[in-house]
Structure formats: C-alpha cells, structure tokens
Amino acid sequence: EQPVVDNGAGLSRNASITASGLGQMLQNAWVSPVMPEFVSSMPIVGVDGTLRRSKSRFAGAAHLKTGSLRDSAALAGYVDGASGQRYVLVAMANHANAAAARTAWDALVDWTAAQ
C-alpha cells in the first residue's frame, strides 16, 4: 500500500501510511546514500527531542521519531540491540486514548534494545 502525503509536514488527517509501509520505508532508508543524514536527524532516546525524558534503561540505543494528532500517536525508527543487531521499530495507535500507549512503547523499546 502506498503512503498518502497531503502537505509534507505529517500534520494532516488526510495523510496515511500503514505500520508495515513505514517499516519498509525505514528499511529502504537504511540502505540509502542519505542514511547517515537521515538517522542523525532523528532524536536519540533519552538524549534529545520528544523522547529526551524517556524512562528507557537504554538511553542512547535508539533513534526514534514520535508523532501525534488528536486520537492518534506513533513511534518509529531504529533501535540498536545489545547483540549488535539493529532493528526497525514502528508502533501506531489510533484511539481516543492513544497517548496511553506510550508506556507500553517505552517497554517495547527497552525489550528491543535488550535483544
């Protein structure tokens, strides 16, 4: 399924992408010539951006971007596992209480980083 881009900022209810589609895009970006700049533009968990106050035990082990609109929230990017494996992580919630998913997502990031 192709993503639908409305205004380029991601702040439109007319824009859409599936979790699978976003994951594929992140995998493709990893092998792209612009990968270093792309990844460095993403906040580091526990260090900067909207995840600087994350309670993750693995601060510094992930480059993740958050996004939210009323009744929806998302988290996507790359997590470095303890084994040296790098993982693509995508989480999306579309619900009136979508922000409540953040606690579970913190646990998901920690679990992934521990792998």
Protein language model features and the residues they cover:
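Small-residue-rich helix-loop
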Residues: 1-115
